[in-house]
Amino acid sequence: MVWFLGQKADDRTGATWSKALQNWTALEYVVADAGTGLQAGIAAVQQQRQKEGQPALENGLDVFHTTQEAQRVLRLIWNRVDRLWEQAEVASRRVAQAQQQGQDARGVAVAARSAWTKAEAAFQQYEQSEAGWKIAHAALQVFRPDGQLNDRSWAGEQIALALPQLSGREWSKVRGILQTEATWTFLDRLHRQLQEAEPEDELRGALVRLWWLRRQRPRATTVGAIAGASHVAHLVHQVVCHQRDAHGHASYRQVARVLGQTVRARSAVECMNSVIRMHQARHRTLTQGLLDLKRLYWNCREFRGGKRKGRCPYEHLGLKLSSYNFWSLLQEEMITALDEAKAKAKGKGKAIAA
């Protein structure tokens, strides 16, 4: 969650992105959007590593942006439905008005039927697209709707079912992303890391199931009686896991760490965008100095929720600073910069006097 790079570049070409990634020799996994320049830069780094015999760099497409694009298309289709529906209602009112006035309503009636046919067809297209995206979106999750761990085989079957329903030019970008290998990199990594965490298949499956059940428990703020067995299912399954392996606590911690650290989307980047775009109306020109200032602000800002709550990115990174307060660090930097500027000015004055 630390913001490391914040360089203002002249362009976003593959060469620029490749240069930015060159120094990160220990980087194992990249989650990025489908931008042409960014993907070209990642591909260049992958090829260079392969050529030099270095560890491979895995590349995964960002699920967040795939979902965002799908929602944009759904809004576009719904707006079309809304517009055609309003036109059909206007046409129906014209028919009623003509009949009330004793006029020949056959012409406007034909127009009304045509308008309603278009509106109904658009609505059916929306329903079809919505159903198709619901299937595809489920395939992008770590767990299936039934609680089983997602895998390439099941995800591929779901995408095959969804694609025919995502028809039309509007869906071309989403269809392309769903058929790209990089979209499923997170599943490949997930299963590989889980196998490394617990080699035994049956025990690994039981521990994954336990992790999922623990997250289905009703929240402490739930009001009223709790129906079903969701509040005790994880306890029962915990006994089952203990019977399989009495010393499985260490294995569970490793499995839980893998599942908890599975990254499918670069949502952190979207959080940082909110900081970058802060006061954007006044910051017409985003200079490198202003970018550095915003980066410092982000890295010193405490998380307000989640498992990182109460600590800032620099603290989670393990970076030791005199203070993690943004203003305190900024004042220290200003004092240091002023002292250096005074010393430099004093040196120039002595040189001139001499």
Describe each model-derived feature in a short phrase.
Residues V30-D33, H65, E270, I276, ...:
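Mobile genetic element proteins and their domesticated derivatives, centered on retroelements
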Residues R83, Q87, V95-A98, G102, ...:
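Catalytic-core elements of nucleic-acid end-processing and repair enzymes
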Residues H65-R75:
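Short, conserved secondary-structure transition motifs
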Residues V45-N59:
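A short alpha->loop->secondary-structure connector
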Residues Y29, E58-L61:
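Hydrophobic "anchor" residues on beta-strands that sit immediately upstream
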